[in-house]
From Swiss-Prot:
Alphabetized PANTHER family for the sequence: CELL FATE DETERMINING PROTEIN MAB21-RELATED, CYCLIC GMP-AMP SYNTHASE-LIKE PROTEIN-RELATED
Gene3D superfamilies on file: 1.10.1410.40
InterPro entries: Mab-21_HhH/H2TH-like, MAB21L/cGLR
Binding site for Mg(2+): D71, D73, D181
Source organism per UniProt: Crassostrea virginica (Eastern oyster)
Top-level lineage group: Eukaryota
The protein's role, per its UniProt record: Nucleotidyltransferase that catalyzes the formation of some cyclic nucleotide and plays a key role in innate immunity. Directly binds some unknown ligand, activating the nucleotidyltransferase activity, leading to synthesis of a second messenger that binds to and activates Sting, thereby triggering the immune response via activation of the NF-kappa-B transcription factor.
TM stretches of this protein: none
EC number: 2.7.7.-
Known cofactor(s): Mg(2+); Mn(2+)
Protein name (record): Cyclic GMP-AMP synthase-like receptor 2
Keyword tags: Immunity, Innate immunity, Magnesium, Manganese, Metal-binding, Nucleotidyltransferase, Transferase
Family statement: Belongs to the mab-21 family.
């Protein structure tokens, strides 16, 4: 096979891979949107409006290199505070640079007094967050104090991993499952006047046409985020304009192929260039937007390899010129000149000139994602890609289980208020009923919310019904559910498997020792009690074993058989669903098995014990964070 044929083969495989990957991401998009909506119901605090930003809501096709975690981006807007883009209002943005990118937020004495007595806002606009400006008769909002106050008042639960930096807008951290990038912000009352060229420069038949730009101008807000300009004397007092919402609209306007190729470009950039520490993905994203706007290319038919090579040339030119123009602000160069060194320039030039390196990077991606083998694979071996991709019949199960988990958790939190709990239940049932995937949750949710037993029993309804009865100490109902389905160890391919959720609210006297052991060990690992999902059939088998332990009528032989069956089934469970790693069905099941081992040893019950796989020994750094969108 010659080089041209090999490239065609690689392009065809990449196109099939991206289409399959993207279609699955779009399938679960509404599930994830509802997940976020439910979570926002829990964290809805009067002074804060929570926005999602970043690659997920931009609908980039997400592909993460190994060991690179996919974080979740939140923008926390302070409600009922709008900053004037110019003028002398009670609170206004005063640019400190000609391009309007950076500036300070100035507040009048009268407006300051009103903020500090407002019931919801006084905890954000504190004495320490406002200092008298020596250049004007006003107060300056102190960015770092503002950021900390907003995060504290938002109620967002996560562990901060870094101290806030004056040059960065976010307060990064991590939750039990994912990394978080949290950005407090304030809304501008209008787009800056420095955006007039962006509004008018679109061509009628271009991707970003003029009529679309006018709609974005009206519908998408511009925020101010706490970030200072390198080497500026005002650095610790500065905010900068953020166009994260218009950027989301740009991605919505892109042709599907280009949106998918953005994800591929991000993978290649992260894999090859992120360690150099020069340009960030933010710079590359704007270069890509400029490519789409300026270059006369048929974006609906460009090949993946050609797209990447074109981008590489654009990055090389940008580094040589020291120029990355802001996509929205006029005459605003955001090139990171302070990071420029000979070594970094040389590394970029060498890597971006080596097109074979990019090709090998793409082949490595396909090997990792599709073949799961370390052997050398040529492009010709990637034929029949679609047949290697898993069926999507049960693809959404993990995402539905995650959604069910957060719904149950928030419902448990609101149960203290009957009115709030009823309102929450009605809203969730309505939202779940509109999508073909989330509709699968309705029967189970009615079981939780209303106690409605479905007419047609399934593994899911039996397991969740048994769990609710079990946590109330009603073993008769549990045994009835178990006897109807526990003997069936296989489920039809088209069945949706919804895990049983275990949370900190289930730490009641009815919670047995093995389940409590699993929760305790995971809490030790993560510093908080995570929401745990048990495979429904595993839970039913567990209940049978618990019932046998309580009665002990049949001697040790029956107990030994049930424990052996539970252990054998746990080995067949997925280590990747509903999360990869320590919150997977398999890992949680192994922890329950360890809990049984501890119990049997302490009670001197003489039955065979089972060693579980070493990766659930929690001293190993195995995290459940999303590293890539799993096709395996």
């Amino acid at each position: 096979m010659n080089a041209s044929e090999s490239c065609e083969e690689l392009n065809a495989t990449l196109s099939a891979y991206l289409e399959s990957l993207d279609s699955r991401q779009r399938q679960v998009e509404e599930i994830r949107q509802l997940h976020h909506k439910v979570w926002a119901m829990k964290t809805n605090h009067a002074p804060i409006i929570e926005h999602r930003a970043g690659s997920r809501v931009e609908k980039q096709t997400r592909i993460c290199p190994n060991d690179i975690r996919s974080d979740i981006d939140f923008m926390l807007e302070v409600n009922n505070v709008v900053v004037f883009a110019k003028g002398n209002g009670g609170i206004c943005f005063q640019p400190t640079s000609r391009d309007g990118y950076f500036g300070r937020i100035l507040i009048s004495d009268q407006y300051r007094d009103s903020l500090m007595i407002d019931t919801h806002l006084k905890a954000i606009f504190t004495e320490s967050s406002l200092k008298r400006d020596k250049f004007s008769n006003r107060f300056v909002l102190v960015p770092n104090v503002f950021k900390q106050n907003v995060v504290r008042e938002s109620g967002l639960k996560y562990q901060q991993t870094k101290s806030p930096q004056s040059t960065g807008p976010s307060i990064p951290g991590r939750g039990v499952v994912n990394e978080y990038d949290v950005v407090p912000c304030l809304r501008l009352n209008t787009w800056p006047e420095e955006t007039t060229t962006w509004i008018s420069r679109g061509k009628p038949l271009s991707v970003f046409d003029p009529s679309w730009r006018k709609k974005v101008l009206v519908a998408s807000p511009v925020f101010l985020v706490a970030a200072g300009e390198i080497n500026s004397c005002f650095q610790k007092e500065q905010f900068r304009t953020s166009f994260s919402m218009p950027e989301i609209e740009c991605f919505k306007k892109l042709p599907n192929l280009v949106r998918q190729l953005f994800g591929l470009a991000k993978y290649v950039f992260t894999y090859l260039l992120s360690s150099v520490g020069f340009l960030s993905w933010f710079h590359i994203k704007y270069l890509l937007f400029w490519m789409v706007e300026k270059d006369e290319i048929d974006w609906n038919n460009i090949s993946p390899v050609c797209f990447l090579f074109h981008l590489m040339d654009s990055i090389k030119q940008s580094v040589r010129d020291g120029n990355v123009q802001h996509f929205f602000l006029d005459n605003c160069n955001i090139f990171p000149e302070h990071r420029r060194t000979y070594e970094r320039e040389y590394a970029y030039d060498q890597i971006l000139s080596d097109k074979q390196l990019v090709t090998e990077c793409l082949k490595r991606l396909l090997r990792t994602e599709l073949l799961e083998t370390s052997r050398t694979v040529m492009a010709s071996e990637f034929t029949n890609t679609e047949s290697r991709l898993v069926s999507s019949n049960t693809y959404c199960d993990g995402y539905l289980t995650r959604l069910l988990s957060v719904i149950v958790f928030v419902w448990q939190e609101t149960s203290a208020s009957e009115k709030m709990s009823s309102s929450f239940a009605e809203k969730i049932l309505e939202d779940c009923g509109v999508n073909e995937y989330t509709r699968k949750l309705v029967t189970i949710l009615e079981l939780y919310f209303r106690g409605n037993v479905p007419g047609k029993l399934s593994l899911n309804s039996l397991a969740h019904g048994a769990f609710l009865a079990y946590m109330q100490g009603d073993f008769a109902v549990c045994l009835s559910s178990c006897s109807q389905h526990v003997t069936s160890t296989c489920v039809r391919d088209d069945d949706c498997i919804l895990g049983v959720t275990l949370t900190r609210y289930d730490r009641t006297p009815h919670l047995d020792e093995p389940l409590r052991f699993a929760l305790d060990r995971l809490e030790q690992k993560f510093g908080t009690c995570p929401r745990v999902s048990l495979h429904p059939l595993f839970f039913l088998k567990h209940v049978l074993l618990q019932c046998e332990l309580k009665k002990r009528d049949n001697g040790l032989k029956c107990l030994d058989t049930l424990f052996s069956d539970l252990h054998g089934f746990s080995k067949s469970l997925s280590p990747r669903t509903p999360y990869c790693g320590l919150l997977s069905y398999q890992a949680v099941a192994f922890l329950v098995i360890e809990g049984y081992n501890e119990y049997f040893k302490r009670e001197n019950i003489d039955i065979r014990l089972y060693e579980t796989d070493t990766y659930v020994k929690l001293d190993i750094s195995l995290t459940p964070a999303t590293c890539s969108f799993d096709l395996r």
